[in-house]
Amino acid sequence: SKKSKESREEKQERGEQLMRKMGIIEIADNDINEVSGGQLQRACICRSMMNRPKLLFADEPTGALNRTSSNEVMDELVKLNNEGTTIVMVTHDAKVAAKCGRVLFIVDGNIKGEYTGLKEITDEKERERSLNNWLLDLGW
């Protein structure tokens, strides 16, 4: 069966819901030069979520952001993941990786290790410490 066509109004409403969820509805009409890096990243996440994907690829989603904006973007990605969207993310930032439920350490395209022990740890600092210890054990 064919997917039902969504009306322009339905798409508009979903876009506004996503912007509210990401905390950027107030910048919806702003020029791109008038928004912060964190707001722009959240706008990109909104755009990628418009078609309700089951899987989202995020390549360094916090790479060019300050720590505050990075935390905001990661908080939104964690929420999306908790709502059922699988997220495959590339990052070189251990603080960012510590927010993930499963971490693969990849060198030259080869998986050198997999860590899933973060799921049970609720304290953010303890998650970071646990991941850093695992990375040290791998020689990183």
Region spans (language model):
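Catalytic Walker B motif of ABC-type/P-loop ATPase nucleotide-binding domains
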Residues: 56-59
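Conserved catalytic motifs of ABC-family nucleotide-binding domains
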Residues: 52
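Conserved ABC ATPase signature
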Residues: 31-35, 39
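Conserved beta-strand-loop-alpha-helix hinge in the C-terminal portion
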Residues: 110-136
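Conserved ABC ATPase "signature" region
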Residues: 9-27
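Hydrophobic anchor residue at the start of the ABC signature
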Residues: 45
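ABC ATPase C-loop
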Residues: 48-49
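Helical segment within the ABC ATPase nucleotide-binding domain
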Residues: 71-83
